[in-house]
């Protein structure tokens, strides 16, 4: 009997054939924590009596409150830097960028098992790795032992065929999946992506889809590793990390869903649940006023996302009543955007370009909303209070829809600007 991608990766990391439903002890290739979870992880690591870090690649990321907006957070970040020096763990600091983007650029390989004290570690699935979020204690154990127990998940096969029409993007695909499955429809399962649309999709778009697998409850969102993966790794200067990795043709899935990409329209997730998804063309008729537009995050803060948004805004300009915030996902994205003149153009259009990091998305700083305000963001979550104010409303959409909304001042279908 064939194996799913999840079963293949766990079999390699356990050292024997394993199947969905088994509880296994597996070695981990990459472990990480960020500044919200890192201090907890470090305290647990010390309390458990560990003296050295045994996971092959261990990282700490200061990205959530970066640069630090208050002294309490500064002290927590200081602890992380000191731990990094003591244990030989690389610390990515203010301005370096968001953990998931950096891991994709520099470290994640197809077939890796990646565990992070951050729920969006599933982003690694875009490169054919099993990335999953875990609690700080579990990650502390991985730091200290290089392994942990896992339950090999059942897999939902998601088949996306056809070609996306102009104005429709990977973000719309994952919002459609959220609409179909609901916010808990894949709890403790893996999503595995197939179909002609996925095969023709670059890794940047695959990362967007894998990033939001957790928003339907999934432990991981797994893409095949193929020539598109090789192209991405070559672009990142590490083609040697490539290996082809796909599920077996006779793999057994818990269930299967099919999506026809050709029929998809731009979608928007309305407050306060990610699965509260509607067509932008319908919502546009309601003329929902938007106060702030945020283009960035680990979901949609890559170079191509900024380029898509700029193309619309450059032609049509920003509405004077909209605050536009742009956040490149990493230092590399920021530098590439600088070299291409993208940052300069955003600034000239009236945008606030912020350092690479998570700040607005997690409601810590650089974009906290006022009471009664509405934001349209390219991020991955819109539950009440996510961006720092429970009395505000968060709408989720693609960079193109975000840009079109910044042009008009209300939620707008981007297809009329393309």
From Swiss-Prot:
Its EC number is 4.2.1.33. The keyword Metal-binding applies. [4Fe-4S] cluster binds at residues 298, 358, 361. Pathway: Amino-acid biosynthesis; L-leucine biosynthesis; L-leucine from 3-methyl-2-oxobutanoate: step 2/4. Its cofactor is [4Fe-4S] cluster. GO terms for molecular function: 3-isopropylmalate dehydratase activity; 4 iron, 4 sulfur cluster binding; metal ion binding. Binds 1 [4Fe-4S] cluster per subunit. GO terms for biological process: L-leucine biosynthetic process. Keywords: 4Fe-4S, Amino-acid biosynthesis, Branched-chain amino acid biosynthesis, Iron, Iron-sulfur, Leucine biosynthesis, Lyase, Metal-binding. It catalyses: (2R,3S)-3-isopropylmalate = (2S)-2-isopropylmalate. It is an enzyme of class 4 (lyase). Pfam families: Aconitase. Catalyzes the isomerization between 2-isopropylmalate and 3-isopropylmalate, via the formation of 2-isopropylmaleate. NCBIfam families: hacA_fam, IPMI_arch, PRK00402.1. Heterodimer of LeuC and LeuD. Belongs to the aconitase/IPM isomerase family. LeuC type 2 subfamily. This is 3-isopropylmalate dehydratase large subunit 1. It comes from Thermotoga maritima (strain ATCC 43589 / DSM 3109 / JCM 10099 / NBRC 100826 / MSB8).
